[in-house]
Amino acid sequence: MTNSNRLFYGSCFALITTAFSFSIRAGILPQLAESFDLNGQQLGFINSMWFLGFPISMILGGLFYHTIGPKRIMQFAFITHTLGIILTIFSGGYTGLLISTLLIGIGNGCTEAACNPMIADAHEGKQMNTLLNRFHMWFPGGIVLGSLVSLLMTSLDLGWQAQIWIIMITTVIYAYLFMGQTFPKPRTDAVTSVGENLKAMISPIYLFILGCMALTAISEFGPQQWTSLILSSSGAHPMVILALITGLMAIGRYFGGDIVHKYDQTGVLLGSAVLTAVGIFLFSTQTGGMVYVAAIFFALGVCYFWPNMIGFVAEKIPLSGALGMSIVGGMGMFSTSIFQAIIGGWIDSSTAEQSAKGLTGTTLELAAGQQTLTYMISFPGILIILFAILYFWQRNAKAAAA
C-alpha cells in the first residue's frame, strides 16, 4: 500500500536539502575563499558545478524513471548527497570542492526527476496542483531557513564545516521517510513507454511550453542571482530583499492549489508574467522603500512559474511522462546557466556606458544596475505575449472538446 503522505513529506525534505545546499553553500563562500585561498573565478566555477549536475541528473532520471523507478533514483540521490557533503567537509582544496559540489548538484537533480512525477502519479486534479505547489514551496522556504541558519552559525563563529553538516540532517530525514515505502504506479500505461513520451514531446504544445520554460526560469532566477550586485546601491538591503522574495514565494506556493483551481494554470501563468514584469520595472526605476514594494510584485509573479509549468505538463500533456517533466525542468536550469553570462555582460556594458557619462561610485553602480534590470524586463514581457497565446489556445481547445 502506498503511503502518499509519507512520500510527500519525504519529497519536501529532499527539496529542503536542495535549498540548503544552495543557500548554506552561498553563505560560506567567503570562508571557503579564505580557507583554500580561492579567487572569484574559482568560486564561480565551484558554484557552476551545482548548476551542471542538476540538469544532467534531472534529464537522465526522467529518461530512466519508469525503468528503475523513483525509489532507486532517490536512493542514488541519497548516496550522491552524502558523498558530496562528506567530500566538501574533508576537501583538500579547489578540485575536491568542484567534485563535491557536482555530486550535490546531481543529487538535487535526482530529487526533481523523481519527486515531480511521483506526486503527479499519486494525485490528480486540484490535489495534484495543490501538492506540486506545496512541494515547490520548500525551495524558497528552504533558502530562507538555510540563509538564517548560515547567518546565525557564522555570527557564532562556527566553522563552514559545521554548517555543511546541517545539510546532512535533512538528507538523513528524507532517506528515513522514503525507507521501505511503496511508490505509486503511473496512472496511464502508455506513460511508461519512452516512445510514447517522445511522441508527446514533439507536439506543438509541448515545444511551446519548453520555450516558455527557458524564459520563466531566467525571469525568476536572473534578478535574484544578481540582487546583491545590482541593488546594493539602491538604498535597500539586498539580503532583506532576497528574504522577502523567497518568503513570499513560499507563502504563495502554499496557497497555489486554490488559485490554480480558480484561474487554471494558463490564467495563473499569464497573471504571473504581468506581475513579474511590473516587479522588475519597479526594481529598475525605484530606490529606497519602493524597492521592497517591487520585491513584493516580483515575488508574487515568479512564485507560480516553476510548479505550474511542471503541473501543466503533468496535467495537459500526460503522455510525456516523467521524461517530459524532467526535460522541462532541465530546460529551466540550462537556460538559467546560459543567461547568467549574458546578464553579466549586460552589467559590464551598462557600467561602461554610465561611466562614460561621468558617473562614479554608488551613483554609477545604481545607474548601471537599473539599466541592466531594464533589459531583464524583456523576459517576462515576451512571456506576457506567449502566455496570452497559451490562454486562448487552451480555451479554444476546451471549447472544441466540449
Task: Describe the residue ranges of each PLM region.
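Residue-level signature of mid-helix packing/kink "hotspots" within the transmembrane helices
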Residues: 23, 51-59, 144, 246-254, ...
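Helix-loop junctions at membrane interfaces in 12-TM secondary transporters
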Residues: 90-100, 284-294
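Extracytoplasmic
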Residues: 6-38, 116, 223-228, 339-343
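Symmetry-related core transmembrane helices of the 12-TM Major Facilitator Superfamily/SLC fold
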Residues: 161-179, 370-392
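Extracytoplasmic gate region of multi-pass secondary transporters
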Residues: 25-26, 202-250, 339-344
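Helix-loop-helix hairpin linking two adjacent transmembrane segments in secondary transporters
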Residues: 126, 131-186
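Conserved MFS/SLC helix-loop-helix module at the cytosolic interface between two early adjacent transmembrane helices
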Residues: 56-95
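Cytoplasmic helix-loop-helix junction between adjacent transmembrane helices
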Residues: 100-137
